[in-house]
Regions:
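Conserved G1/Walker A P-loop phosphate-binding module
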Residues: 1-72, 88-90, 94
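Conserved nucleotide-binding/hydrolysis micro-motifs of P-loop NTPases
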Residues: 32, 41, 65-67, 101-105, ...
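Conserved GTPase G-domain signal focused on the G5
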Residues: 21-22, 158-168
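Short glycine-rich substrate-engagement loop in P-loop NTPases that contacts/grips substrate
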Residues: 69-81
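Hydrophobic residues at beta-strand termini and immediately following loops
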Residues: 44, 152-154
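Conserved C-terminal guanine-recognition region of P-loop GTPase G domains, centered on the G4
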Residues: 49-55, 78, 82-152
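Short acidic, glycine/serine/threonine-rich loops at helix termini
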Residues: 72, 136, 163-167
Length: 168
């Protein structure tokens, strides 16, 4: 999804389930070295960095992992509430939903919530190499059509697909 080039600076939010590769993608996009861990709750506050592409500056906000954006009266952790409040506040011009391609069904619950919110959305299928190793075949075009937004496959840990994501 192209962001209109009316101004030189744009704000992008990375949102997704815990342990789906948000911070790894954030580091690949921005060149940062944020701490990455193989457990939920590593990112408990929003972190920001930037990158430039085609003469434009993009600020990227790495939100804590969350399974849901529900605003119902249920007990949520601090990291979930940070992500939920940020997305509900419509601060970002584009929400990039990082989805673990090897656990697609579980991750798409959050994606469907974002689609229903009608936020400007781009879905990143991360860890497509792991999905392929598990014998999973994902029809990226069909998924994009079904969701009504662009879908970009990447392997953030290796930087594969990051240039295509920046161009999207």
């Amino acid at each position: 999804m192209k962001i209109p080039a009316m101004k030189n600076e744009h704000l992008i939010a990375l949102v997704g389930n815990p342990n789906c590769g948000k911070t790894t993608l954030f580091n690949a996009l921005t060149g940062s070295r944020q701490r990455v861990g193989n457990w939920p709750g590593v990112t408990v506050e929003k972190k920001s960095g930037e990158y430039r592409h085609d003469g434009l500056r993009f600020e990227v906000v790495d939100l804590p992992g969350t399974y849901s954006l529900d605003v119902v009266d249920r007990e949520v952790s601090l990291d979930e509430s940070v992500a939920r409040d940020y997305v509900h506040g419509n601060e970002a011009e584009l929400v990039v939903n990082i989805v673990d391609a090897a656990n697609l069904e579980r991750n798409l619950y959050l994606t469907t919530q974002l689609v229903e919110m009608r936020v400007p959305l781009l879905v990143v299928l991360n860890m497509v190499d792991v999905a392929q190793a598990k014998g999973l075949a994902i029809d990226v075009e069909a998924l994009a059509h079904k969701l009504g937004c662009p879908v970009v496959p990447v392997v953030a840990s290796e930087g594969r697909g990051v240039d295509a994501l920046k161009a999207a």
